[in-house]
């Protein structure tokens, strides 16, 4: 008899991956599906980065790497943080992993004991609460609705902190909402955290360069917060390198050493060839990053304009990332005569089957009244997707 662990059985499957799989299954059957469920850029990795990887292969750069990554990559990250963020770190305060996802999970696993609480603002990326549960901690969900641009307030943070609180996960720019915390908003959160020195901040900044409101702001830029903050970042989103799997943490050396110890026992260092590519991503020209950001902003403007014209959608303007997160609960309880919509997951499935547009219901993001749409696709796909969605929703009575 097969018996899986309680740890595994406590986890929920990824809704984003599940919807992407269903979309791909329909495509394989010949259905013309427009996929707005994916969380990755639709651009190709810039040529100069690919050339660096090719050279690494030709140079037989194919051995096991040090667990935290090669010094050359970690030093490139140190320079990036200094130049772009005004933050001083040493290479010993950097640990590279197989994507930012592993970097987040490593940090949670080395910090959280059974019974510890981790504050997770909602809407959240689907994996945050599951990672906390994997560490046998308790995710404490703090909800922020569309009326506050999906960003928690200092008062909400203060109310959520208890003696059991070990960490706060803060994602800005946000997946799934595209919300971005301003310097003033981060200052308000920092003032609360100053009263609770036991709380570590895990700052997921993977969408740093897909930001439409100016220079990126990190909570680690506040002097009193730097030694209590673990920055998580990587090359996936900014450089269109999702499959290369390079992420990193920058933070207090005691946490970085712990992550190295943990990672050394289950994956070791990340891919050597990918590290060479990531090194060149950070040290080479940044023009492709700027061009992709401009394209994403144009698409953001387009999808917001079109979605605001969809009856029943409540839309805010995302300030970063490449997601729209409209409120859609006006459709709950309605039917097209064949299917009744109970929640946003039902609505997402209805849109996939009726409009052949893949979106992701908001329940897995901690916001069951919303639905996530990725605009990491062509302008033409955005226009056609919203047309189909509008037509399908009009059938619900």
Q: What residue spans do the PLM features occupy?
A:
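Conserved N-terminal alpha-helix of the aminotransferase class I/II PLP-enzyme fold
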Residues: 64-97
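Generic structural signal for well-ordered alpha-helical scaffold segments
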Residues: 24, 78, 82, 108-109
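PLP-dependent class I/II
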Residues: 2-4, 8, 12-14, 19, ...
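Glycine-rich phosphate-binding segment of PLP-dependent enzymes
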Residues: 45-64, 78, 83
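A glycine-/small-polar-enriched, mobile loop at the entrance of the PLP active site in fold-type I
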Residues: 37-40, 55-73
């Amino acid at each position: 008899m097969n018996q899986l662990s309680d740890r595994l059985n406590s986890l929920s499957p990824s809704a984003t991956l599940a919807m992407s799989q269903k979309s791909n299954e329909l495509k394989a059957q010949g259905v013309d599906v427009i996929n707005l469920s994916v969380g990755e850029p639709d651009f190709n990795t810039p040529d100069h980065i690919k050339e660096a990887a090719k050279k690494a292969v030709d140079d037989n750069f194919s051995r096991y790497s040090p667990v935290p990554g090669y010094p050359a990559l970690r030093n490139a990250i140190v320079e990036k943080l200094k130049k772009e963020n005004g933050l001083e770190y040493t290479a010993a305060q950097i640990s590279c992993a197989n994507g930012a996802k592993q970097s987040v999970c490593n940090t949670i696993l080395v910090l959280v004991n059974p019974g510890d609480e981790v504050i997770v603002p909602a809407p959240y990326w689907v994996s945050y609460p599951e990672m906390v549960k994997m560490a046998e901690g308790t995710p404490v969900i703090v909800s922020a609705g569309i009326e506050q641009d999906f960003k928690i307030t200092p008062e909400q943070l203060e109310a959520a902190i208890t003696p059991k609180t070990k960490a706060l996960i803060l994602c800005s720019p946000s997946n799934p909402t595209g919300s971005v915390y301003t310097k003033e908003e981060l200052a308000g959160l920092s003032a609360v955290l100053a009263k609770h020195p036991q709380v570590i901040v895990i700052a997921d900044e993977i969408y740093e360069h897909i930001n439409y409101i100016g220079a990126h702001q990190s909570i680690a830029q506040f002097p009193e917060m730097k030694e209590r903050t673990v920055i998580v970042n990587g090359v996936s989103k900014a450089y269109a390198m999702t499959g290369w799997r390079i992420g990193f943490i920058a933070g207090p050396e005691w946490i970085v050493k712990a992550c190295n110890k943990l990672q050394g026992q289950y994956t070791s260092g990340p891919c050597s060839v990918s590290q060479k590519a990531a090194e060149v991503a950070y040290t080479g020209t940044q023009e492709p990053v700027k061009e992709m950001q401009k394209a994403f902003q144009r698409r953001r403007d387009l999808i917001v304009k079109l979605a605001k014209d969809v009856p029943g959608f409540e839309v805010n303007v995302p300030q970063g990332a490449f997601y729209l997160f409209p409120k859609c609960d006006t459709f709950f309880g309605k039917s097209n005569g064949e299917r009744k919509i109970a929640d946003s997951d039902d609505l997402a499935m209805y849109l996939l089957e009726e409009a052949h547009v893949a979106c992701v219901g908001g329940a897995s993001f901690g916001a069951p009244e919303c639905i996530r749409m990725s605009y990491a696709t062509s302008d033409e796909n955005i226009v056609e997707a919203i047309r189909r969605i509008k037509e399908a929703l009009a059938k619900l009575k």
